[in-house]
Amino acid sequence: MAMNKKIAVVIGLSILISGCSSANKEKNYNFIKGLNEYQKNDKVSALENYKKAYEIDKNNVVLLNEIAYLYVDLGNYEEAENYYKKALEVKPNDENSLKNLLQLLYLQNKRTEMEKYIPMIVDRNSFVYNLNNFRLGILENDEDKVEKSLLKISSNDKFLEEYNENFYIDLTSVAGLSDNTIKYSNTIFEKAYRKYSSKNKNIVKIYANFLIEIKEYRKAEDILMKYIVNNEDNLDEYALLKKLYTKENNKQKLENLKKILRNKI
């Protein structure tokens, strides 16, 4: 799930640690204990303590989101949905709750549910709104919806505010849909590559794979070779080069690559 835990924890602490009543102290104690257990990777104990805090304050949106997030981590999507929906009952247009719920619904191919919650996003120019319409278009095999959503995303740099790897993987999955899809996706990838490639290996692999799928072989080769030259951890990039040379039937480069890999191993 795409959610910045560090930010969530800071916000959660600022909201939850308030007041001085005994009930508030107990709630804060259970919440902090839950955080500590989560950091130790004891998710079950963390959930138990969050639930104790929840029994004291059932209308805390941050706490409801934390419980839902933990249920996702534990693989219980049904309960996670319930808690995200409880958060939206308390605060109907909470973007964080909507973002996380819609991500969960998309993973489960729940189109009807997505159609219900997407209109609750207030900012129709936001990345969250356009992302979920794009994903709905994928699930519905609606080429027009996919194109329109990607045009809006590519025309606005809001998608760069937070790295969303699942989004870039989704882009690769629609690479061959249409010329416009390729055009808008390429614009998005170029911006993401410029911003993230120096610190994030995965965007290099995903972008290169996209370029291979659309037969931009030389461009894919360039970014893979640049990564390989500058990084020792590069076996995945060599594997993508092999895929590239195989797809374009470049026997000479494929043979040279095999020699390099034999020496490397």
Question: Which sequence ranges carry the predicted segments?
Answer:
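N-terminal leader/linker segments that initiate helical-solenoid repeat arrays
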Residues: 11, 17-66
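Canonical tetratricopeptide repeat
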Residues: 32, 66, 100, 132-135, ...
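Register position in tetratricopeptide repeats
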Residues: 39-40, 73-74, 104-108, 139-142, ...
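Structural marker of alpha-solenoid helical repeat scaffolds
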Residues: 56, 90, 123-124, 156, ...
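Residue-level recognition of tetratricopeptide repeat
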Residues: 60, 94, 126-129, 160, ...
